[in-house]
Amino acid sequence: MTNIRKTHPLMKIVNNAFIDLPAPSNISSWWNFGSLLGICLILQILTGLFLAMHYTSDTTTAFSSVTHICRDVNYGWIIRYMHANGASMFFICLFLHVGRGLYYGSYTFLETWNVGVILLFATMATAFMGYVLPWGQMSFWGATVITNLLSAIPYIGTNLVEWIWGGFSVDKATLTRFFAFHFILPFIITALAMVHLLFLHETGSNNPTGISSDTDKIPFHPYYTIKDILGALLLILALMLLVLFAPDLLGDPDNYTPANPLNTPPHIKPEWYFLFAYAILRSIPNKLGGVLALVLSILILVLMPLLHTSKQRSMMFRPISQCMFWILVADLLTLTWIGGQPVEHPYIIIGQLASIMYFLLILVLMPAASTIENNLLKW
């Protein structure tokens, strides 16, 4: 008799995706982040659901409802901080997952990669709208500044912004719709993640060498299930250390002040995971130019398969490209630091140089390094 997991219509899907899936025998811990992102998403949906039970999306009560969650709801404080810091863990995993894809040439799986880029945009949109919900100073002014960027779009810009706001400023209508979108988007992300996985399983996983592993496959369970459980335990450990010992470490103190349209905070800045893009935005003196650079800083990922000039897929055996990759990582860390600094000398020029370096590395230096390595192979 055949095992039920191989015959049952529903269990068959689970079996082919998580149990009997043929996986390369040599994938490293950098391949753990997909499952960790899945865990982050489930955690965010669950904590978010319980927060939504007590939250009110009205400008007069939003701030106090969050205070009520933290003070009066049973374990409300831990749910709130797990949700806020869970977002940070989500983005740490996201950046490492994308970085892994860049390093090992996983972007040659075109559909998987492009769905992944859409997932990144959707997650960033969700996180931005979630940051607005507590209705603190940084929530209000962050929403005002970022939505205002759309006014840079020629001809329709101003109308578009007022349409998104639901009025002539960020107000009750804006908060209510942001809550609605913040609630629905994670489910859209879940659906996209399933599509992401569907496309991945059409080709099978990449591996550190970038060479086909069809001749050397092992079942996903128990080898990678146990490996993923270890990763999950480390993720939860890191999250709980953050939640229980330093819950406000990554937040902004300004968000503990209720939103006040008459008082602008001295430094308006987004959460840490958007700072690199924010630094690129600020480094261009022109509004439309800044907005385009901001969008392109992420959208440039779509071009990665076109910019791949190397004869090898992975960077494992390409020392010059490795060097370029780690310079790019250092550049992104520099941009993240600059994004959190005030707009004054020397931060302005550092930000501008780091922004130029970012696009130069991806569009020119990395493809050039690959071409040089191709020629060195002939020697």
Curated annotation (Swiss-Prot):
It is found in: Mitochondrion inner membrane. Its cofactor is heme b. One of its GO terms (molecular function) is metal ion binding. The chain crosses the membrane at residues 33-53, 77-98, 113-133, 178-198, 226-246, 288-308, 320-340, 347-367. Keywords: Electron transport, Heme, Iron, Membrane, Metal-binding, Mitochondrion, Mitochondrion inner membrane, Respiratory chain, Transmembrane, Transmembrane helix, Transport, Ubiquinone. Gene3D superfamilies: Cytochrome Bc1 Complex, Chain C. Pfam families: Cytochrom_B_C, Cytochrome_B. Heme b b566 binds at H97, H196. Heme b b562 binds at H83, H182. Binds 2 heme b groups non-covalently. It is a multi-pass membrane protein. A ubiquinone binds at H201. One of its GO terms (biological process) is mitochondrial electron transport, ubiquinol to cytochrome c. GO terms for cellular component: mitochondrial inner membrane; respiratory chain complex III. InterPro entries: Cyt_b/b6_C (IPR005798), Cyt_b/b6_C_sf (IPR036150), Cyt_b/b6_N (IPR005797), Cytb/b6-like_sf (IPR027387), Cytochrome_b (IPR030689), Cytochrome_b_C_euk/bac (IPR048260), Cytochrome_b_N_euk/bac (IPR048259), Di-haem_cyt_TM (IPR016174). It comes from the Eukaryota. Component of the ubiquinol-cytochrome c reductase complex (complex III or cytochrome b-c1 complex) that is part of the mitochondrial respiratory chain. The b-c1 complex mediates electron transfer from ubiquinol to cytochrome c. Contributes to the generation of a proton gradient across the mitochondrial membrane that is then used for ATP synthesis. Heme 1 (or BL or b562) is low-potential and absorbs at about 562 nm, and heme 2 (or BH or b566) is high-potential and absorbs at about 566 nm. The cytochrome bc1 complex contains 11 subunits: 3 respiratory subunits (MT-CYB, CYC1 and UQCRFS1), 2 core proteins (UQCRC1 and UQCRC2) and 6 low-molecular weight proteins (UQCRH/QCR6, UQCRB/QCR7, UQCRQ/QCR8, UQCR10/QCR9, UQCR11/QCR10 and a cleavage product of UQCRFS1). This cytochrome bc1 complex then forms a dimer. Belongs to the cytochrome b family. This is Cytochrome b. It comes from Connochaetes taurinus.
